[in-house]
């Protein structure tokens, strides 16, 4: 017999659902160990907890309900057209507030949302470092949403279409807000090309979503910008791929198991979701739901 119980085994022992176990962990009411991203429960300590001492301690230590322990039904962070569509079509009841990945992280820290869309570039990948530094001891989980192709979106009537980032010099460049993950990606690409922001010719106005950036280019307010293939295709614009990024969802663990988010997850396993991703273009959804980091 193992000295440790898994979450499923403990839920069966307590005759509760697994999400109730996560609630008790989040409240600090259960003896738990975190090993390689998994929660394990020491059998002897659990038996003592069941014996009564743990129950009394749980009643004393359980925190009062607060906005942070029950975040509002909002998904914040980076914008994604496929995610925006899925939230509507799934009828999950989750509201969207897309104002950039960094803005979403700040809102999560303040307990203002149940999930955050992230595409923060890091030396060894995407998003994990940004999450680990802020939420190491809090009950959040980072799951993959999709991989997206990002590159230069430009007008089809440009005399000399860009073949690399350096070719945008002299063209009116459409920027995003500083909190947007795409601005972090742009900084990395500029560094790789040994370029600086001063080498760009930014238009005065910024755009706050992927589709708004493409709209600005299609209406002639800008010549080029860094965006995703799906947005370029929506507005019949030309596209030069530069990299593939991983867009993840950072989810409050309890909310992950609640009906609204589970409704979204169920919808995303249906054929209509895959068909929409294919129609939009530039998406790889084969890794949807993969856990990339488990906090707490």
Report residues per predicted region.
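N-terminal hydrophobic or amphipathic helices and topogenic motifs
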Residues: 1-103, 112, 135-140, 160, ...
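Short loop->beta-strand "edge-of-pocket" segments that line small-molecule binding or catalytic clefts
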Residues: 68-78, 165-184
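Ligand-binding cleft/hinge of the Venus flytrap
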Residues: 85-91, 176-178, 182-205
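Short helix-initiation/N-cap motifs at beta->coil->alpha
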Residues: 97-106, 198-215
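Short beta-strand-centered segments that line the small-molecule binding cleft or hinge
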Residues: 104-149
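A ligand-binding cleft/hinge motif common to bilobed small-molecule-binding domains
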Residues: 120-133, 214-243
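Periplasmic-binding protein-like
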Residues: 142-151, 233, 237-266, 287-293
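Flexible hinge/capping segments at coil-to-helix
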Residues: 145, 154-173
């Amino acid at each position: 017999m193992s000295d440790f119980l898994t979450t499923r085994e403990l839920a069966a022992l307590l005759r509760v659902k697994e999400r109730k176990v996560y609630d008790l962990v989040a409240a600090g009411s259960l003896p738990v160990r975190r090993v390689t991203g998994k929660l394990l429960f020491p059998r002897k300590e659990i038996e003592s907890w069941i014996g009564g001492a743990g129950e009394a301690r749980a009643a004393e230590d359980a925190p009062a309900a607060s906005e942070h322990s029950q975040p509002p039904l909002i998904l914040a962070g980076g914008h994604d057209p496929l995610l925006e569509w899925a939230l509507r079509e799934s009828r999950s009841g989750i509201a969207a507030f897309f104002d950039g990945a960094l803005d979403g992280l700040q809102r999560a820290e303040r307990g203002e949302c149940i999930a955050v869309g992230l595409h923060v570039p890091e030396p060894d990948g995407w998003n994990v470092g940004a999450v680990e530094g802020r939420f190491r001891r809090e009950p959040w989980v980072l799951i993959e949403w999709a991989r997206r192709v990002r590159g230069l979106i430009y007008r089809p009537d440009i005399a000399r279409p860009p073949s690399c980032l350096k070719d945008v010099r002299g063209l009116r460049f459409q920027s995003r807000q500083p909190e947007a993950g795409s601005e972090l990606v742009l900084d990395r690409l500029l560094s790789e090309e040994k370029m600086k922001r001063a080498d760009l010719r930014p238009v005065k106005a910024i755009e706050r979503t992927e589709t708004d950036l493409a709209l600005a280019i299609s209406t002639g307010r800008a010549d080029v910008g860094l965006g995703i293939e799906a947005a370029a295709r929506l507005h019949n614009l030309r596209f030069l791929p530069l990299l593939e990024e991983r867009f993840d969802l950072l989810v409050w663990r309890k909310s992950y198991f609640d009906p609204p988010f589970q409704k979204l997850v169920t919808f995303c396993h249906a054929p209509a979701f895959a068909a929409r991703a294919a129609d939009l273009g530039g998406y790889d959804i084969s890794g949807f739901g993969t856990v990339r980091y488990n906090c707490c």
